[in-house]
């Protein structure tokens, strides 16, 4: 079986890394956008949600606005002139609390070793043919 090397290549020549299954200490790639997943099969299983890690404060501000419907925090929505697309993707406080509760055990537990066969072959899906 061929192992999937998480974070080995950015997506389509960008600085975006698919780190959805990554669970490794000190693995952040500087100057990148690393996308994590907390979907039910992932190491820190919260049922849904994720996060994007970055050390770029401008990207962090933009991503935060996009996660909150394109709105700026702490400004009443009626007073805003929305300048970017938004997705309503913020994590609920209840899910974040569950993550904090599950984190210590996830840190102790050995992560799953994903193999390439764990993903479907996109070339066989009608939409990609």
Residue map of PLM features:
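Conserved PLP phosphate-binding loop immediately N-terminal to the Schiff-base lysine helix
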Residues: 1-37
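Active-site region of PLP-dependent enzymes
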Residues: 23-25, 30-129
């Amino acid at each position: 079986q061929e192992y999937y090397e998480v974070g080995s290549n950015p997506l389509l020549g960008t600085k975006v890394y698919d780190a959805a299954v990554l669970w490794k200490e000190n693995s952040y790639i500087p100057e990148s956008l690393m996308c994590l997943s907390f979907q039910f099969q992932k190491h820190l299983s919260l049922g849904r949600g994720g996060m994007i890690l970055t050390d770029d404060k401008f990207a962090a501000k933009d991503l935060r606005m996009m996660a909150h419907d394109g709105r700026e925090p702490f400004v009443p929505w009626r007073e805003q002139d929305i300048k970017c697309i938004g997705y309503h993707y913020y994590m609920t406080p209840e899910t974040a609390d569950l993550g904090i509760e599950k984190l210590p055990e996830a840190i102790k537990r050995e992560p799953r070793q994903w193999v390439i066969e764990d993903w479907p072959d996109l070339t066989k899906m009608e939409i990609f043919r």
